[in-house]
Amino acid sequence: MINRIVSFFILCLVLCIPLCVAYFHSGELMMRFVFFWPFFMSIMWIVGGVYFWVYRERHWPWGENAPAPQLKDNPSISIIIPCFNEEKNVEETIHAALAQRYENIEVIAVNDGSTDKTRAILDRMAAQIPHLRVIHLAQNQGKAIALKTGAAAAKSEYLVCIDGDALLDRDAAAYIVEPMLYNPRVGAVTGNPRIRTRSTLVGKIQVGEYSSIIGLIKRTQRIYGNVFTVSGVIAAFRRSALAEVGYWSDDMITEDIDISWKLQLNQWTIFYEPRALCWILMPETLKGLWKQRLRWAQGGAEVFLKNMTRLWRKENFRMWPLFFEYCLTTIWAFTCLVGFIIYAVQLAGVPLNIELTHIAATHTAGILLCTLCLLQFIVSLMIENRYEHNLTSSLFWIIWFPVIFWMLSLATTLVSFTRVMLMPKKQRARWVSPDRGILRG
């Protein structure tokens, strides 16, 4: 009951902040925040991405002719693949995992109660491949339980966790484990997912997202201390760190965000390794994209509510930038909503003590935002072209994705944050088969 009261109070507070600004100061100030918060964050991402590239990334070996990574003391690596109804993808995924140039690996596929032919495919492959172990769960328990099961069965201290449709690059496992060998406080490393599905407008737009937004965000967050979340499709973990925090939570809709915060709130560090490439399938329909992003946004809100009080301990001060960024982005979304409502009420002729003359960007603000989109594209293209040379084929969509990114964030934040604050609950988070694209690119 207390959690419900607190969460309802938070929702009211988020709504009241823009209303108070508009009422006690001016509606124009409120709308300036709407226009310039994305502007400020984009500058942060550009500066952070460039800094990470100049002082770290550009010095790292990479390329077709680069030698296979040599890991200190030749540790074993366990690649864990949780699978649910992956009959179309799992065989290709396992073959890519086994094709690593680093040889001291084992692959563990966890069949999470699949109802298609996944079980039969895994059993056939396990009989033929010595380095492959298969675990079958009788019923669908959710990705968190599947990952826990794989971790319990693994022989290695270093766990590389990927989705059942993900294709690892030939050196991804070695690259993503390497930072943990040189820093004993690195508890997890997040990789660099790349989009395979590009046959529709929705697919091409996501190429722009992962090229011009996601990579810059990860680089920037790594520079100022902590990462909001590891990638759910490719991440490596130190098993002792997972054991310390209780592994993955089975009641959180996004186990990747939750485990990232659990590790960092226990003083473990998360590193970003852009050379750990992983090729993934993504939604290519608007319905599939909406469901996926709504789930991501809801996961962020759940983690925020879960850790809100713990964040204020002085030992967690490095998490404060992430906390304030999340709070301000959420307030930004509700400020947009309040602005639209006020403007609509004024158009209807209802008298208000708040004056709002426009909700669209001014000429100057529009030019600034468009220029920043172009600059962000140029920076991301210069950095990401190292890993994916055909990005110019998606040139048009990449340029405009920053605008689409913020609009999508606006809609999903409004829906998910309201849902979580009004209906906080604890139940097992189980997965369903997502939209995996219409045609593989």
Curated annotation (Swiss-Prot):
GO terms for cellular component: plasma membrane. It is found in: Cell inner membrane. One of its GO terms (molecular function) is acetylglucosaminyltransferase activity. Disruption phenotype: Cells lacking this gene do not synthesize PGA. The chain crosses the membrane at residues 5-25, 33-53, 331-351, 363-383, 395-415. InterPro entries: Glyco_trans_2-like, Nucleotide-diphossugar_trans, PGA_PgaC/IcaA. GO terms for biological process: cell adhesion involved in biofilm formation. The keyword Transmembrane helix applies. CDD domains: CESA_like. Keywords: Cell inner membrane, Cell membrane, Glycosyltransferase, Membrane, Transferase, Transmembrane, Transmembrane helix. Its main location: membrane. Residues 1-4, 54-330, 384-394 are periplasmic. Belongs to the glycosyltransferase 2 family. This is Poly-beta-1,6-N-acetyl-D-glucosamine synthase. The lineage of its organism: Bacteria, Pseudomonadati, Pseudomonadota, Gammaproteobacteria, Enterobacterales.
